[in-house]
Regions:
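Conserved helix-turn-beta segment immediately C-terminal to the redox Cys motif
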Residues: 77-78, 93-116, 135, 184
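Short pre-active-site segment immediately N-terminal to redox-active cysteine/selenocysteine motifs
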Residues: 77-79, 84-87, 118-119, 161
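Short, internal strand/loop/helix patches
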Residues: 128-164
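Thiol-/selenol-based redox modules, centered on thioredoxin-like
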Residues: 161, 167-201
Length: 201
């Protein structure tokens, strides 16, 4: 139990100036995020006054920004965005949980990794670091570490910690997100509910 509580709040943090973008935040419109397996996410951003946000262990302001995104692809499934860096131990620790969830739910969910080392100041040998990360951790899920990530990072106003996991439904609507190495059971519960709703539509 104590270990579980520790993992819930365990997240990699960097100084505020490296995690937060200093660029002017522009509204995203049809931003294409290309994955290393050829899959593509299309991200749009909208302004909303809706205050009924659903977030866990993260400040409301960030939840508002994430809820304003519409994340779609050519697949009608639940999408899980996994923001991470290659040096973050909690990020590595959560990989096995993500792989378990992908196997459990199959094509009804899509898990997309988004590496941000270079966006938080770790620019040296970024491509090589990602390739080593893939090999050492036998990472097989779709992964983005190319162009256009910076625009998404800027629209988010930076990221407060990692791993950051965000769920969107089959229509691209925000569901929920988590900060830190959270228990697999929590993600499984939320995914089960979302998949069940998707099946009834």
């Amino acid at each position: 139990m104590i270990l579980g509580i520790g993992l819930f709040f365990n997240a990699c943090e960097k100084p505020k100036e490296t995690l937060e973008t200093t660029q002017e935040q522009a509204t995203l419109e049809n931003l294409n995020i290309l994955m290393n397996n050829g899959e593509k996410l299309i991200i749009n951003q909208r302004n909303t006054q809706d205050k009924n946000h659903n977030f866990k262990n993260i400040e409301p302001k960030k939840a508002n920004v994430l809820q304003d995104l519409l994340v779609t692809s050519d697949k009608k499934n639940i999408k899980l965005l996994f923001f991470f860096t290659t040096w973050c131990e909690p990020c590595v620790a959560i990989l096995s949980h993500l792989e378990n969830l992908q196997k459990q739910f199959g094509d009804e969910i899509g898990i997309y990794g988004i590496a941000i080392d270079d966006l938080v100041g770790e620019t040296e040998n970024f491509q090589e670091s990602v390739e080593v990360f893939i090999q050492e951790n036998q990472y097989f899920l779709p992964l983005a570490y190319g162009k256009n990530r910076e625009e998404l990072f800027s629209a988010l106003g930076g990221i407060d910690g990692i791993p950051l996991i965000v769920l969107y439904d089959e229509k691209g609507e925000y569901i929920i997100h988590y900060l830190g190495a959270i228990p697999e059971e929590m993600m499984e519960f939320d995914l089960s509910q979302s998949v069940a709703k998707m099946r009834t539509k």
